[in-house]
Amino acid sequence: LIRFAVPIAFVCTSLTVRSAEPNLTSPQIPKLPPGFDPDKMSEPKEAAKAVEWLEKEYTGKKSEAVRMLLAILKGMRADGKDAWFGPAECRFDFTWLAGRAGVDPKKGSIPRDRLAASVTLAERLDRDGDGKVTPSDLDWSDQNPYVMQVGFVNRLFRRMDKDSDGRLTREELDELLKRAAKGKEFATAEDFRVLMIPRSAGSFGPGDGPSVPMLLRSLFTQELGALAEGPKIGDTAPDFMLKTRNGKETIQLSKVIGAKPTVLLLGNFTCGPFRAMYPDVDAVRERYKDQANFLMVYVREAHPADGWKMDSNKRSGVEVKQPTTLDERVGVCSQFCAKLRPNMPVLVDEIDDPVGRAYSGMPGRLYVIDGRGKIAYKAGRGPFGFRVGEMEQALVMTLLEASPKKDH
């Protein structure tokens, strides 16, 4: 059991602390070449030497932390396709679902009415709405056409959501149209392309792209992602005890787990994609609040002002340094709660990140834990693996698993 608590009283103040430089001798950091200096890794020759050393040192299957380190040094794109982040893991798949419905999986489809008495549950599995569930409906891989469209729309949504609270308002849409039209009565497709597609290198907006040294430092401080890989499918969920953000309630995970499955969410204020997608998680909670428990653990900042800072955060009014005390983290969490208005309990991780590390929860991740306390679903690491629709389907199948089978 991981035990820690948040002070009952706290005050939200501006943060003036300075983030510490990463400790390159920490046992959590992969073994590094002698004399390794992140600042020198912006030189291709130095980075190539480090890659050569690491690939000799780590043969065979490599940990996620080593894969991420190699990806950075090789100059791979910061996205979900170039070995940055592993895919989600789930106990359920189409074969399991077909067996549950009494259908031969080789047929390639399951009539929706064979799945459950609840129409709502079946609808969430039938992603394309054609009345049956196919392997494509459950496919959340990067190459799936639906997933690619979701990613594109999510990026556009974030650029339209000016205050970055995950809620697009009429005022924001009106402002967007004015900016695109530039005084005209209308906006053309080209006007929107110029406005919405960043005029910068790569997939990052202006002022958001990191240098190689910054990526390395963010990895070593676990702002880019926790170095531990977290529990696997079928593992018992690591227990913990935390107070809610306002200090009024203490919650222990093992006492929440029981007849209902539990959705565990880990995230932070300075991760723009997490802010954009958080309301989707709250919407899932609203749909299943009588059938499942929902908890959020607030973890280490992904893009603090004294780390890999992003100009897009500053433009949205999100500018905080990395907290170095628990009180400061509670204060930043309070800013998150004021902006996002979460409807589920929000717990604050201890400043040395025991829960974030135990669940590999930085910068964000989703889990579904079944009624026996076992991991049924583990999302890919955020932001690219943070797929709320995928989590919801896993939750639906967890509910189906625990319910009486329908007579066929």
Which residue ranges define each predicted feature?
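Thiol-/selenol-based redox modules, centered on thioredoxin-like
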Residues: 213-217, 350-408
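Primarily EF-hand calcium-binding motifs
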Residues: 90-107, 116-129, 152-164, 170, ...
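N-proximal helix/coil linker or "cap" segments that precede and/or mark the start of modular domains
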Residues: 195-243
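Structural micro-motif
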Residues: 237-239, 260-261, 341-345, 360-367
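Structural microenvironment flanking redox-active thiols in thiol-disulfide oxidoreductases
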Residues: 273-340
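Bacterial N-terminal signal peptides
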Residues: 3-18
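Aromatic-flanked redox-active Cys/Sec active sites in thiol-based oxidoreductases
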Residues: 265-271
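A short beta-strand-turn-helix
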Residues: 241-261
